[in-house]
Regions:
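N-terminal pre-domain/capping segments
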Residues: 1-93, 117, 128, 166, ...
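A cross-domain feature marking catalytic cores of carbohydrate-active enzymes
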Residues: 5-9, 31-35, 58-63, 97-99, ...
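Aromatic/hydrophobic pocket-lining residues that form the small-molecule binding cavity
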Residues: 14-17, 42, 76-80, 120-123, ...
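Acidic/histidine-rich catalytic cores of soluble enzymes
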Residues: 19, 29, 59, 125-225, ...
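Active-site acidic/histidine proton-transfer and metal-coordination neighborhood
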Residues: 50-51, 70-171
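Short, electropositive alpha-helical surface patch
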Residues: 111-119, 150-167, 222-237, 260-276
Length: 280
């Protein structure tokens, strides 16, 4: 696998970003640019990655195409289309978003409507519409799994891939987001193995993080955290990823704020990988 993440830290442009990239030791990164970034600046970021043999693994959308505000929803949809078009032009394999929600609580919030048949059909239409507008050849549009939003299981994701029925719709793996109940948490290694076994042919990018649940506090609270701060068995999980994914599969750390936090998490996983003969 190619272990990496988001390059964090203070930078004002590609030159300072490149310095952080080198220090990070990342082999794969999220795109530090978007469709709104001036092309000269985008090209400078890409050149920095090329100089150091780093793969730009994914470009994010992270906007709610089902926003209850029609203007915001339309803007989000146009951004998704633009990001996918940019990814395809630049050869970035994964353009990732979440399915969307009509909740007023937030762009990625839980809502009773998230699991209705009407919403499921709307997701299919939305994904098809985005892909059909762009007609990508190299990039894939993917949905990140969410604890309270489709897709929320490997079987659900497989069914969605079949129902969308577009060759450029693929999978973005976030197994911690799908560890959304005590059963999956307590059998996390087995569940992650199931995710990889079923979805590996479709996975274009993977997020890696940790999770924890207090064993006696009621009621259940599952808390995402950085690798090493939770209870996941990364020796076994890295082996699953190593055996189940291609050697050049990007595996990305996320949701940290500072360079130091990413550095610590990367070092933790790199140490485990080294102890177990796993190439990153």
């Amino acid at each position: 696998m190619l272990l990496g993440g988001t390059v964090a830290g203070p930078y004002s442009g590609p030159v300072e970003w490149e310095e952080l990239l080198v220090r990070s030791r990342f082999k794969a990164v999220t795109a530090p640019f978007s469709m709104h970034t001036p092309r000269k600046e985008t090209d400078a970021y890409r050149a920095a990655c090329d100089r150091h043999g780093v793969v730009i693994a994914e470009i994010g959308v992270w906007k709610n195409v089902f926003d209850p505000d029609p203007a915001a929803a339309a803007e989000a949809l146009d951004f998704a289309v633009g990001q996918l078009a940019l990814a395809d032009e630049l050869g970035i394999p994964c353009c990732v978003n979440i399915a969307g929600t009509v909740s007023a609580a937030g762009w990625d919030a839980a809502d009773p409507s998230n699991f209705t048949e009407e919403t499921y059909e709307r997701i299919i239409r939305s994904v098809r519409g985005i892909i059909d507008r762009v007609e990508p050849k190299r990039s894939f549009y993917c949905l990140e799994p969410m604890p309270w939003m489709i897709p929320d299981s490997p079987d659900n994701y497989l069914q969605l891939i079949r129902d969308v029925d577009r060759p450029q719709f693929a999978a973005h793996m976030d197994f911690v987001n799908m560890i959304n109940c005590p059963r999956r948490y307590l059998a996390s290694v087995e569940f992650i193995g199931e995710c990889i076994k079923k979805l590996a042919p479709y996975i274009k990018s993977t997020h890696i993080k940790d999770t924890r649940m207090h064993p006696t506090n009621l009621t259940t609270i599952l808390e995402e955290c950085s690798p090493g701060e939770g209870t996941l068995d990364f020796a076994r999980i890295l082996k699953i990823l190593d055996e189940g994914l291609p050697a050049d599969a990007p595996v990305l750390l996320e949701h940290m704020t500072t360079f130091e936090e990413y550095e610590k998490a990367y070092g933790y996983l790199a140490g485990i990988a080294g102890e177990n003969g796993i190439s990153i």
